[in-house]
């Protein structure tokens, strides 16, 4: 049985719902879903340049979990860019 998921504090607002290649209708694209906590980790780690320890504390999670979320988010973004997929962003700010 997996451990219960810990509540994560999220603060970043998402400016749009999707990034996709120009000229290709979204119905024809493979979609990659970026979760809200992955978006927050990407924002804190790469945009705000916070250390993993500080960013993890802000989100209310362990440093290891933050690192895992950041790695997952980076992989999804890189895959979407290099393979021409649509990147679907979270739309509701929620505590999960």
UniProtKB/Swiss-Prot annotation:
InterPro entries attached to this UniProt entry: RNA_pol_sigma_r3/r4-like, UPF0251, WH-like_DNA-bd_sf
Highest taxon, organism lineage: Bacteria
Pfam families attached to this UniProt entry: DUF134
Recorded family membership: Belongs to the UPF0251 family.
PANTHER family noted in UniProt: PTHR37478, UPF0251 PROTEIN TK0562
HAMAP family xref list: UPF0251
Protein name: UPF0251 protein Ssed_3913
């Amino acid at each position: 049985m997996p451990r219960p998921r810990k509540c994560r504090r999220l603060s970043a607002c998402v400016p749009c719902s999707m990034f996709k290649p120009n000229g290709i209708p979204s119905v024809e694209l493979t979609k990659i879903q970026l979760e809200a906590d992955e978006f927050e980790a990407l924002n804190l780690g790469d945009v705000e340049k916070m250390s993993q320890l500080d960013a993890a504390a802000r989100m209310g999670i362990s440093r290891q979990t933050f690192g895992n979320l950041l790695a997952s988010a980076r992989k999804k973004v890189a895959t979407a860019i290099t393979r021409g997929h649509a990147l679907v962003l979270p739309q509701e700010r929620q505590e999960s």
